[in-house]
Structures are given as structure tokens and as C-alpha cells.
Amino acid sequence: MKTNELRNLTTAEIEQKTKSLKEELFNLRFQLATGQLDNPTRIREVRKNIARAKTVLRERELGINNG
């Protein structure tokens, strides 16, 4: 998910997206531990998406208008 797409969402939607991404990351890590993960790069993508979402939320808290 791109940062601009996140900026178009409401704060509640971003928080919900972050929650679902964290759940996905948990499941991916579990699959990795059990040897069932097909695409290990997906873990990195999900982690980066979580960081992007948290960054947009923090920008809103601080009143920073990027993008």
C-alpha cells in the first residue's frame, strides 16, 4: 500500500488497517516458523506497510501535512 493511499483514508480506517496488517504479520511469522511460508519477502512488505501507516498517524498527531 502506498503512502498516498493511506493519507486518503480516515484515522479510524488507518488504525483498522494497521491492526489487520499486524495480524497478517503474526500469521506470516507463524508460517515461517513452521516452514509453510511460500513468499518470505511478504513479511518485509507487511512490516513496511505497518510503518507507513504508523507514520501517517503520527504526522496527523503532529499536524504535519506531507503529500
Curated annotation (Swiss-Prot):
One of its GO terms (molecular function) is structural constituent of ribosome. Pfam families: Ribosomal_L29 (PF00831). Keywords: Ribonucleoprotein, Ribosomal protein. GO terms for biological process: translation. Transmembrane segments: none annotated. GO terms for cellular component: cytosolic large ribosomal subunit. Belongs to the universal ribosomal protein uL29 family. PANTHER family: 60S RIBOSOMAL PROTEIN L35/50S RIBOSOMAL PROTEIN L29 (PTHR10916), LARGE RIBOSOMAL SUBUNIT PROTEIN UL29C (PTHR10916:SF0). This is Large ribosomal subunit protein uL29. It comes from Halalkalibacterium halodurans (strain ATCC BAA-125 / DSM 18197 / FERM 7344 / JCM 9153 / C-125) (Bacillus halodurans). The gene is rpmC.
